[in-house]
Amino acid sequence: AYDNIARAIADYERSKEVQAFSSRFDNGELNAQEQKGKVIFGVHCAGCHSMEPENSAPKALFTTYRYYNIGLPANVEDGVPGKDYGLGGFLASENAPLAYAEGAQEEMGKFKVPTLRNVAVTPPYGHNGIFATLEEMVRFKNNRQEVWNTNGPDVPENIYDLEGFGQMGLQDEDINALVAFLKTLTDL
């Protein structure tokens, strides 16, 4: 069921109504810092935020449409009590088709990988809005353990633990370059 939902959303996101594809990235207008950020992105981020067009998209949407739990900390200031179990929470709810309930536990805490198109103009970041700036989000993905030392993951089950995720080892200059690249994905 959620594959069909993802496909419907993907079709909408590929439409010209949503994607003008007029960004500096699309026009090939990157300065040296942004180009460095693009290289870093290709190494550390493109596995989930694909730089290749998916299916029939005319340009890259910077998402694979998959679901992961990246271990975001709880946002106690969002006014929503309790944990947000994401896809697993929905599949375990009375609103979900009964056929999917048995796989719900494996999906706890998972959220769809968002497109990064226009990401610079869509704060706050994270499914729960825990990070106010793009830089804070990148710093979390660079070293999530540092954030967890203060505020652990909201849903500790099923955390995505691909080698390097949350421990990229980027320095401030690299983080600034990556953020600069992400800003080039904004339509003009």
Regions found by a protein language model. Name each.
Residues F25-A132, E136-F140, V147-G152:
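Short glycine/threonine-rich turn/loop motifs
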Residues A1-V39, G47-K59, Y160-L188:
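Post-cleavage N-terminal segment of exported redox proteins
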